[in-house]
Amino acid sequence: MAEKKGSSGEKTLYCSFCGKSQHEVKKLIAGPSVFVCDECIDLCNEIIRDELPPSTEARGDSSELPTPLEIKTNLDNYVIGQEPAKRTLAVAVYNHYKRLRHQEKAKKDDVELAKSNILLIGPTGSGKTLLAQTLARMLDVPFVMADATTLTEAGYVGEDVENIVLKLLQSCNYEVERAQRGIVYIDEIDKISRKSDNPSITRDVSGEGVQQALLKLIEGTMASVPPQGGRKHPNQDFVQVDTTNILFICGGAFSGLEKVIDNRTQSSGMGFGATVKSKEQRSLTEVFKEVEPEDLIKFGLIPELVGRMPVLATLAELSEDALVQILTEPKNALVKQYSKLLAMEGVDLEIRPSALKAIAKKALARKTGARGLRSILEQSLIDTMFDLPNTSNVDKVVVDESTIDENKPPLLVYREVAKKA
């Protein structure tokens, strides 16, 4: 390194790259017969920063992306059963985020990978929403859940479809880059089906009209989102969000779809030689396994929307055994949650196997799936939880079959109090 000011007989040194003298730069670093100035070093650092990060970043992201097996294993911790749906979701989500990695380092002449949005079909309480929530939590991406029944066409009372993107932005503190890689779950998508499978000649602002509005959003468009929400109006600033890389998962119970599938798969026969099958022979789960895009169109979804959700996963009706597992096995199982609540009062909770089966049977009778389990358990413990804070020496609360079926109060086990001498 040379000083800027030398003695009168000292030779002036120059940068071997830009040609500036030692007096024109702050520092000059000397090598074997070569000199480089601080400005050229800064320029080299900028070039390296511009060229290297994409490839190294892609390698780092790829290693952090969980495999389909890891995604499914994580789903197993929270969602009981639904093996085919979990495998389908795991592959679809893995491919989606792998596609995003590919886009970051792809060249113009590379194969362009299209987005595959997902449609979940299953009875109420079968785990559609929980699957989407668990996926987003595992991948650490912004997640928002929207209700399709609240959406209307632009210009009508209700929510615009852009409000979905606004909620996604709000979930990540308006970080546009993060929001553009998030997951949107649209629930009750079956409730916006058009009223008949013929094109509508009248305005259907909460059915076919909403489906049309969702088309471009799901496929990928530059959405103009009002930062404060509400309706758009002139002279307003908008946040531009590209929805191309947002993964849309739509879900619905599709009540009545089984009739459409039956009409297609079971041709009615006439005459003595005809085979007539009872529709009661097949469960809802078996019927849903045979769903085709044409059935969804017949049900009331417009063909364009069905085409934009190529990944189709059906969820099975939950059996009594599955509901018992849901009560006890997942990480955030209901029994564990209520045990934790009572432990805060210094009391243990015991729910006997017969009571677990009774809860499952009651939920099946209500046809609410896993969603009905909490209300049944809450109802059986509500009076006990009300009294516990004012009751001393309770050691354990025991719930048996009679508590569920006959609404009898749970059994309270008291601690032995040492008698005073």
UniProtKB/Swiss-Prot annotation:
Top-level taxonomic group: Bacteria
Keyword RNA-binding: no
GO CC terms, sorted: HslUV protease complex
Tagged with keyword Zinc: yes
Disulfide bond entries: none
Annotated InterPro entries: AAA+_ATPase, ATP-dep_Clp_protease_ClpX, ATPase_AAA_core, Clp_ATPase_C, Clp_protease_ATP-bd_su_ClpX, ClpX_bact, P-loop_NTPase, Znf_CppX_C4
Keyword field: ATP-binding, Chaperone, Metal-binding, Nucleotide-binding, Zinc
ClpX-type ZB domain boundaries: 3-56
Any Pfam family: AAA_2
GO molecular function, one term: zinc ion binding
Matches recorded under SMART domains: AAA, ClpB_D2-small, zf-C4_ClpX
Residues the entry annotates as binding Zn(2+): 15, 18, 37, 40
Positions with a binding annotation for ATP: 123-130
GO biological process: cell division; proteolysis involved in protein catabolic process
Family stated for the protein in its record: Belongs to the ClpX chaperone family.
Subunit structure: Component of the ClpX-ClpP complex. Forms a hexameric ring that, in the presence of ATP, binds to fourteen ClpP subunits assembled into a disk-like structure with a central cavity, resembling the structure of eukaryotic proteasomes.
Role according to the record: ATP-dependent specificity component of the Clp protease. It directs the protease to specific substrates. Can perform chaperone functions in the absence of ClpP.
Name of the protein in its database record: ATP-dependent Clp protease ATP-binding subunit ClpX
Originating organism: Albidiferax ferrireducens (strain ATCC BAA-621 / DSM 15236 / T118)
Phylogenetic placement of the source organism: Bacteria, Pseudomonadati, Pseudomonadota, Betaproteobacteria, Burkholderiales
